[in-house]
Amino acid sequence: LADALRHQRNGNYKQAIAAYLSILEHDPTPVEGRQARFHLAESYLLSGDYAAAAAAWESFLASYPEDPRLPRAALMAARAYRAIDQCEMAVPVLQRHVNSETVLADLAYEWIGDCHAGHQSFEEALAAYRAALDVSRVPDVEARLREKLASIYLDRGDYDTALAEYSAILRLALNEEYHARIEYEAGQVLAALDQPADAYARYHRVVESAPESEFAYPSLLALAEAGEKVDEFQAGLAFYYAGKANRDAYGAAIRAFDRYLAQEQVPKADEALYHKALAQQAMGRTPGALATLESIILEHPHSPWLEHAWYEKVVTLARTGSVGQAVQTYREMVGLFPDSDLAAEALWQVANLREGAGARAQAAVLYRDLQSGHPGFEHAGEALWRAGLIDYLAQDLDGAADAWQDLADTYVGSPFSAGALYWLGKLAGAGSSQPENEHWDQLVDQHPYDWYALRAAQIRSGTPLTGTRFVTEPLGPSHWEANEAEAQLLHWLAGWTDVPTSTVTAPADLTATLDQQPRLQRTRALLESGLREEAIAESERVLSAAWDDPLALGRLAFFFHGQDLYRLAARSAIRLAELWPEGRLNNAPQTLLRLAYPLAYTDLLSAEAQKRDLDPLLLAALIRQESLFEPSAESWAGARGLSQVMPATGRQLARHLGMEDYAEDDLYRPHVSVELGAYYLTTLLQVFDDQIPVALAAYNGGPGNTRRWLDAVAGDLDLFVETIAAEESRRFLRRVYEGYVIYETLYRGTEPSE
């Protein structure tokens, strides 16, 4: 049974199903038989074989009517029936068990309503949705239910009742975008009721209160079509924000602002001019944008938008290549706003633009000017770093050393000080195969787990950054003694928060109260019902509410970890370290580090590592950076699963591996994602001469780009890392390697220098 459960957890449902069937065929004990039947039905459902899942659940429900998991089983059975369009079977199952469901009763009623609505049984659907509302205590669920009620009333032509539902939704505390959508839809209902004045009032509210919303634009169009008079300033804002999705709207914004500015009373003339200039910039009308910004500067000397206008003028001039004018404008801006971070940001942008355009020497001067003029600016340390790197690439080693020494002396806590100390050490130890100097000693002391410290330690030890350093032995299961871990965390919290002494002496209190929290009860119930995405969404809301509460974050980190929600546990732990006055995760207790650097799916990591001669902890570090061990993770670019493989790459890798029945959704299955990720990393190591950092850069940025970056510096590894054109790829390789060493420290007991 343990093997079957492991296959199921790893997403290898075919193996899990075969294992459960084998158990049932070999005279299991009553307990084993019950467990095998329950998890067999689960596996069918998770695999997408809904007909088999429905049959398996029906058998389980009939065979074990007293099982405490029946409410969850009923939900999963109903989900299977609905997937094969058999609502006539789903509804009775839900109705039989809804009264025994204490946490997800609203969801059961909602699904009953969905089934009735799908079969045009509207009275039954309305009754089910109302029953769901009666038991729901979650605002988001209430809003969703009321939308479904409103939809039915609209389909039936009962606009007044639909409108009442929209009004009820608007009384809930929801985000601005959602509020704007409901307001807009309510306006459409009023228009259908032939109540144009009320409809227009709704549209006006959207335009005036939420001009950034995507529903401000259609509201504006509806008002314009009706010939309704609209505040031209608000119209300009709404058109401007709509321009991000519809470029033509920028032109409409400019015209609206012009009409506003032509009026006799223009109390927001400065703000209108500012957004007009931004719209002109977006349309490529640079001369017009500069003229508009100049109008703010000359005509509104006391405007709160004046500083922003100066900033935009500096950056706009720099974008056109008028660097001298941009710098002169910046100096005028500093004269007016000597302590302005926006002025510093303007010069920072100018320097970045010049460096990106290849004018590196000019950029280095600007970076130095920025740091000397604005030493407290958030990018001041990075400015010195970039100036030093530019000098180094130009063979001005003295200039580079000066910049990096200033950085190391002035910005000790800056993440860029580690790089400065590393390169100062390289300069000091030039020509020595075993550089030993105070810069590297200081680096290792101040930043022990930073890429640069690890690189220095690696050079000193003579250990190559290749696969020869891999330890390929299988990992043991990752576990800890919960009470001991909680006690350690509480003792640490007591040192810098107001955690009660009674809590510290009774570590069980850390998680004991969690079962009393309805939203966490709901999270657990959703997970037990196979609804992981819904559970994660619920947990995200809980985490958001606890974001600034150290004790709550500690509790949540343990709760999420215990529910295999590793990404949420890690985020809770990382946030807790951020709230700590020292603010350095690497100095936090080992318990917190283990929460922030989880180790899951060790059987998969070990199997793939041995098969491909990899280190399983390198795979763990890669997966942590990619997905924080969340199997359902999906990036904005479309990468999926634990290893964040792109669908196109996944298809190619699956062909190479002979996965005949591969489908894109398999990327969400841990055993597939880990295998593809390990195979891809192995391939890249082979392509790039077994160099770990280079292969990691290629994993993120692609082998073609990586080859160009490597060739541009003639294979110099340190310069390769510094000159990777894609910031994300540079950060990725560093973070994965840093994580690799942290994993070794946590789970192998080695030190960075070993």
Across the structure, where does each feature detected by a protein language model lie?
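A short, structured beta-strand-centered segment in the mid-to-C-terminal lobe
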Residues: 662-672
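Short, charged, surface-exposed loops that flank catalytic or proteolytic processing sites
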Residues: 665-666, 688-695, 715
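Acidic, polar-rich low-complexity tracts and alpha-helical solenoid repeat scaffolds
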Residues: 1-637, 643, 653-656, 662, ...
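Short loop-to-helix capping motifs
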Residues: 449, 690-691, 702
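Gram-negative outer-membrane assembly/targeting C-terminal domains
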Residues: 723-726, 731-734, 739-754
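Acidic/histidine metal-binding catalytic segments
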Residues: 615-621, 689-696
